[in-house]
Amino acid sequence: MAAIVETDNGYKKFVEESLASGSVRENTNRTIDGIKFVTFDCPVNPNEPAITGILSSPGDKTWTLINIMPRLPGLAAEAEVQGTCRWEMLVLGEVALSLGHTSVTAVVPNFDLVKHLMQPGTKRYFRLSATVEDLAVREPTPIIVNEGPLYEMELESFLKENPGKTASDFEPVEISTVGMQMLFPRDYSTIFELASPVLSVKHTKLCDRDIVRLEVILHRWEDEEIRTYLYGTPSQIPEGVKEGSEVHGLIRLYAEPIAETFN
């Protein structure tokens, strides 16, 4: 790190803003494929999850690659592993999950340390979280349906219940979008378009940085509901968002496998 700081002023500024003393968590030193993994406890917020660093010394080079990725506290949900993908940078990876009646792909922090927990076909609990890519307040506007199967079904019911009426007397079907939840994949595997009501808002800190945590609904199907925490900086969260607000935007999903099993 010292060598990089001496030769890269931009990196030096980044380090100066982020640097804090810390301690290596016991029994976390591991070497996988020549890469050393160590976990540091956060000295600023002891109750927050640890920061994990990956150190590598390729060949006979004199520099060291360091990557720091904060873990985002998430909400637990049971999922079935469909497959995994390791990133070329040896830092992170992705996991494809069957989550209730939907499927998602999520970034996995510390991928090499936990990939043994994510064998395809296995079911286990994951801590799910998300970060804001782009977010806006959604004003619920009704959807007007004036054609298609739903319209035809409602029209048929209307004519049966109202003898003497005709199709010209039937108003288009209006569907309320208050409390609407949706999740659609976008261009990149771990990016999704989300619409959800906001269940709670909390202003907190992560690695001594101000962040906002929104509790949102990731997936809903009949009586099945899966929630997650959505994180963003204050500038990423639309002004005036509060419990009961409705939001719509792009998010990036994260999933952390839980080693413990539950009956």
Set out the residue ranges of the language-model regions.
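Short, charged beta-turn/beta-strand-edge "cap" motif at the junction between a beta-strand
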Residues: 4, 10-11, 245-259
